[in-house]
Amino acid sequence: MEHLQPSSFTDILELLPGGRSKDPDLSSPNTIRIREAGSPSGYTTTSLGTSFVVDGAPISTNANMQYVAGSWDAATTSRENMNAGVDMRSISTDDIEKVEVVRGIPSVEYGDLTSGLVKIERRRGGNDWNARLKADMGSKLFYLAKGLEWTPQQMTLNLSVDYLDAKADPRNRLENYRRLTFSARFGKTWLTDFYRWKISSNLDYTGSFDNDKVDPDLNNQAEDSYKSQYNKYAFNSHVSLSPKKRIWFKSLDLTLSASYEYDLIKRTKLVQLTRQTVAATATTQGVHDGVILPYKYVACHDVEGKPLNLYAKVNGKFQVPSLVVSNTLLLGTDWNYDKNKGRGQIYDVTRPLYAGSMSCRPRNLSSIPSNQQWGIYAEEQLTLPFAGHSLELVAGIRGTQMLNLPNNYEMHGKFFWDPRINLGLTFPKFNIGKLPSFIRIAGGIGEHTKMPTLEQLYPDPVYLDLTQLNYYHTNPAYRRINLMTYVIDATNQNLK
């Protein structure tokens, strides 16, 4: 990572087998693509199905409903990231100690994924100052961190701040992406006569700001701007209990995390119409009169989201004490809660941003039920040495159920079971010249399940407005447009 001098987590993926080196593009969301050939336009299943786990807690995007309804212009659509997984631009790299990318079959401990798993562990301990300055044609980055470690008390504290300012074109100061992160990580270990207690707690802030504005001098003094801000506040705590002696009980782990976001999109544009256009304002099905729009007006369209995520996990590891066979039995359960408390699409329906193509109405996101998942899992890890060989077996099963679903959904009350198995055989070691070598054959098979997001479970209703009468008169007071409005429920209750 020091060799790459990364600006975001996207750059680290160059180190993966088959990874390509390319210039960073921070003007649009960076989503991960693993186990995928090519990048089909609009196909985000791979990135949505990849789980990012930072210090033991997953990053959830299930409540992300940030999109501008009815948008068709590239300035807006190219920056949307709904149902597309984690935007890697928001992940700072300077605090990272270790990254593990699992493109095969992960442990049953990890659920709500299909494509892969990215495990990130951040640096802890030390007493050094760390700083990094980076400047190139497209971006400027500043990072400062301080580690504090009290050895007698077995306590650590790490503080860090990171700021990034990137431009798609260094000549254009009106389009830029900025990121600001702050992290405080605390760790403490207690020792008793029989057990070792360890606690790790994190407090993080991530701010991501995406701006694009057309120069008024080049746009006939017309306003045309896009502003997006993402503010995330997160807390994560991990408690571990392990015995000092080798007994049947290995460890007990508890992970708790909570995150709250304030996301806001502001799109402002001068709308100029070439013909008489109507704005539909009805929210119920039936016959209604539309509002005839002026030929020129300034439209303001905001999207407010307030995703809330809560996560809890309990793991227990057990073993049969043996000097020959290494074994670990993992038993655990986890619970995940997602809710969006934002106001959603906020705009004047009589002055729409995309006149003539609006098939939606303002909707308060807080009225959407929460998305809750409960998982249980069990896994056995076994290593058996024989005749200089070593046989490794990891086999387990995971069950996941969606809670808080209405009774008319196909997924209501059902458990989705994911059996997974990995098997490896390591042959005796040998030397090639003076170099020690070995051969290992491994394979596996398993099932993964990704649960639907809030938007997929509860999509916006579709409004179909058909013109029945269009009467034009030279006197504007006599003009009238009558519409027949159909409200189409886009909910797919047969998701499974």
Question: Predicted segment positions?
Answer:
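Extracytoplasmic beta-strand/coil segments of soluble accessory domains associated
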Residues: 10-70
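N-terminal periplasmic accessory domains that precede
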Residues: 12, 31-33, 53, 85-89, ...
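Hydrophobic, lipid-facing positions within transmembrane beta-strands of outer-membrane proteins
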Residues: 48, 116, 140-144, 178-184, ...
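Short acidic/polar hinge/loop motifs at secondary-structure boundaries
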Residues: 57-102
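Transmembrane beta-barrel wall of Gram-negative outer-membrane proteins
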Residues: 130-165, 172-255, 259
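Transmembrane beta-strands of outer-membrane beta-barrel pores
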Residues: 135-139, 150, 161-167, 203-211, ...
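Face-selective signature of the C-terminal outer-membrane beta-barrel domain
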Residues: 190-208, 226-409
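Structural signature of Gram-negative outer-membrane beta-barrels, strongest in the C-terminal barrel
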Residues: 367-496
